[in-house]
């Protein structure tokens, strides 16, 4: 047990990343963890796990990031990972209309397992490909409002809004009520630092 476990336990929160194949789930995690992007696409096999410490104003939390495979053959594994998650990050590709439509199914899956006791963030990724955009920002905002979930657009490749995504999620975590209701533009005041001891599950899938 580390010294940080005495008196002031490090609160851990599980974030599960969901969405169709190749929408950029792994790339968002890689950008957040290592501030890097791999142009070579490799599908995640099964489930991958990483964790990162975030320093949020007067408290520290440990985010456990679960990266799920988008392929149909791994779908049966996913409900068990949703079941005890605090946050579900549902990702679609703004250049792929089908991936956007499928987010309704993913969100339904989350609510089937977790009811309303979960934070859901809808993420439109790949804004760097705006010339190929098939899903407008307004469509994403409208769906998020209809389904009562949070919304943000990102580019894992360019790094656009990736830290902001995690800041907003962290500010909405249980016990963060003092920041949960702040306007989104104020979320930038949440301090994000890299942990000196980031960990990766040695049995995880690919990290690209």
UniProtKB/Swiss-Prot annotation:
Please tell me, according to the UniProt entry, what happens when changing residue 71 to L: Impairs maturation of ninaE and Rh3. Causes accumulation of membranes at the base of the rhabdomeres and retinal degeneration. Abolishes interaction with Rich
Q: Which InterPro entries match?
A: P-loop_NTPase, Rab, Small_GTP-bd, Small_GTPase
Enumerate the Gene Ontology biological process terms: axon guidance; compound eye morphogenesis; exocytosis; germarium-derived egg chamber formation; intra-Golgi vesicle-mediated transport; intracellular protein transport; oocyte microtubule cytoskeleton polarization; phototransduction
The question of whether Hydrolase is a record keyword is answered with no
Recorded hits in Pfam families, A to Z, give: Ras
By its UniProt entry, which PROSITE patterns does this protein fall under? RAB (PS51419)
List the expressing tissues.
Answer: Expressed in larval eye, wing and leg imaginal disks and in salivary gland. Expressed in the larval optic lobe, showing an enrichment in the neuropil. In the adult brain, expressed in photoreceptors and mushroom body.
* Reported phenotype of the disruption mutant: Larval lethal.
Task: Please verify whether the record's keywords include Nucleotide-binding.
Answer: yes
List of residues binding GTP: 19-27, 67-71, 125-128, 155-157
Q: Which UniProt keywords apply?
A: Actin-binding, ER-Golgi transport, Golgi apparatus, GTP-binding, Membrane, Nucleotide-binding, Synapse, Transport
One Gene Ontology MF term? GTP binding
Q: Where is this motif: Effector region?
A: 41-49
Give the span(s) annotated as Disordered.
Answer: 176-208
Cellular location(s): Golgi apparatus membrane; Synapse; Perikaryon
* GO CC term, one of those recorded: autophagosome
Query: Which regions are flagged for Basic and acidic residues bias?
Result: 179-208
Assembly information from the UniProt record: Interacts with Rich and Act5C. Interacts with BicD (via C-terminal domain). Interacts (in GTP-bound) with GCC1/CG10703 and cbs. Interacts with Gorab (via C-terminus); binds to a Gorab homodimer, this interaction seems to be required for trans-Golgi localization of Gorab.
Which PANTHER family does the record associate with it?
RAS-RELATED PROTEIN RAB
Q: Which family, according to UniProt? A: Belongs to the small GTPase superfamily. Rab family.
Give the protein's biological function.
Answer: Protein transport. Regulator of membrane traffic from the Golgi apparatus towards the endoplasmic reticulum (ER). Mediates membrane trafficking during egg chamber growth and organization, possibly upstream of exocyst component Sec5. Also during oogenesis, plays a role, together with BicD but independently of Sec5, in the polarization of the oocyte microtubule cytoskeleton, in the localization of oskar mRNA and in the anterodorsal secretion of grk. Required for anterograde opsin transport through the ER-Golgi complex.
- The molecule here is called Ras-related protein Rab6
Which organism is the protein's source?
Drosophila melanogaster (Fruit fly)
What gene name is given for the protein in this entry?
Answer: Rab6
């Amino acid at each position: 047990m580390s010294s940080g476990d005495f008196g002031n336990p490090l609160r851990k929160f599980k974030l599960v990343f969901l969405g169709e194949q190749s929408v950029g789930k792994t790339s968002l995690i890689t950008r957040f963890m290592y501030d890097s992007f791999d142009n070579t696409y490799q599908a995640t096999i099964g489930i991958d796990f990483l964790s990162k410490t975030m320093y949020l104003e007067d408290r520290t939390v440990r985010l456990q990031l679960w990266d799920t495979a988008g392929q149909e053959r791994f779908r049966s594994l996913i409900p068990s990972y949703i079941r005890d998650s605090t946050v579900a990050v549902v990702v679609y590709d703004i250049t792929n209309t089908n991936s956007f439509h499928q987010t309704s199914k993913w969100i339904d899956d989350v609510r089937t397992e977790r009811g309303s006791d979960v934070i859901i963030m809808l993420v439109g990724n790949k804004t760097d490909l705006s010339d190929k955009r098939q899903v407008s920002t307004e469509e994403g905002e409208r769906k998020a409002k209809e389904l009562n979930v949070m919304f943000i657009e990102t580019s894992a490749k360019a790094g656009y809004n990736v830290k902001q995504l995690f800041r907003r999620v962290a500010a909405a975590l249980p016990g963060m009520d003092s920041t949960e209701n702040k306007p989104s533009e104020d979320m930038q005041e949440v301090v994000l630092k890299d942990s000196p001891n980031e960990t990766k599950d040695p049995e995880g899938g690919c990290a690209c």
